[in-house]
Amino acid sequence: MAQANLSETLFKPSFKHPETSTLVRRTRNSQDVQGLHSTLEGEKTRSWYRMINRLMWIWRGVDPWEIEDVLSRIAASKADRSNEQLLDTVIGYRGGNWIYEWAKQGADWQQRATESGDDAQTGQFWLNAANLYSIAAYPHIKGDELAEQAQTLANRAYEEAAKYLPYELKELTFPIAGGGTLTGFLHMPSQAKAPFPTVLMCGSLEMLQSDYHRLFQDYFAPAGMAMLTIDVPSVGFSSRWKLTQDSSFLHQQLLRALPDVPWVDHSRVVAFGFRFGANIAVRLAYLESQRLRGVACLGPLVHHLLSDSTRQQQVPDMFMDVLASRLGMPFSTDTSLKTELGRYSLKTQGLLGRRCPTPMLAGYWDNDPLCPKEEASLIVNSSAQGKLLPVNFSPVYQNFDRALQQISGWLQDKVC
């Protein structure tokens, strides 16, 4: 996109768009449970609608000072808010609005990328832009037009970055049963030759498929593994599909199509699930055990939160809004939403608790409000070859890296 057009698109103030936190209309949870910290989701305080996920944003490559700079601009805004108690609810696409400020930051990096003459630097600048555009769209609520524009910019920047960085990115199109096609990204390491053993990424509900570049760059590529990603239902390239009780539907379509992808060794495929992505990955472990060598999960959501209404009352509103949005239930009553969520439990579906032939690893943090140890243990104890991976909370960044190293090594063992 030409820089002039980008500026016109991004920075022309507009006041007609609904503010993100108003798109899902459900009963708000008590403010008493709003102060929460989760390693994978970040921190929820009384002053922000969104969970501020510094760990994951820094891990993805965003400078900590840049994060604080953007957050301070949002916090300092005097513009009208849909909720005056929440800093990130500025109405309209203008200074102080969450999407505006993060997209503006992304455009700065895009400008630097177009002016850089060094390939490695250009690629990194494009990747920085992609990360910031993705945060602009966070938490990717369905029907948020400005967020959807930011998602498009994130994907464009991500594809531009790959032209300059030392790996190959192929945009693949898969036909989906019932109509339509789905776009996925196949990341291939430069130090090996196709066909590659491949990790099928099953992502978290509030992230784009482009958010997992660091996972490929630092963990899978050095191990000689490719990474195949798609967006979760109702987000990005998967926006035409809502999340259903058959949560693994889209990923299953990809898995079955892999024999036709020449760069993938379809006999050496594993899956990795983040948060709700673990629901998808573990479901695949049962339904497609002949096609998967192993499944690893981190902070899985497969039963307890989905089936326990008391737990649901204890998580931030943003998280419940994301679930409602993915399920296509933005205007449902809490009772209807909680009843429907119960049907997504893999234990309720009759899967978990039954012996699964696929090797499964499940990592968890002590005192994780979304994934107790029992959640990970349920997965491990259901596998013929299960491995439980406890992760200490502090120091957070080092332990997160160590967990990913262990998971990558475990996955590599399964495909070698």
Swiss-Prot record:
It holds the Pfam family FrsA-like. The keyword Membrane does not apply. InterPro entries: AB_hydrolase_fold, FrsA, FrsA-like, FrsA_esterase. It is an enzyme of class 3 (hydrolase). One of its GO terms (molecular function) is carboxylesterase activity. It catalyses: a carboxylic ester + H2O = an alcohol + a carboxylate + H(+). Keywords: Hydrolase, Serine esterase. It comes from the Bacteria. Its EC number is 3.1.1.1. Belongs to the FrsA family. Catalyzes the hydrolysis of esters. This is Esterase FrsA. It comes from Pectobacterium carotovorum subsp. carotovorum (strain PC1).
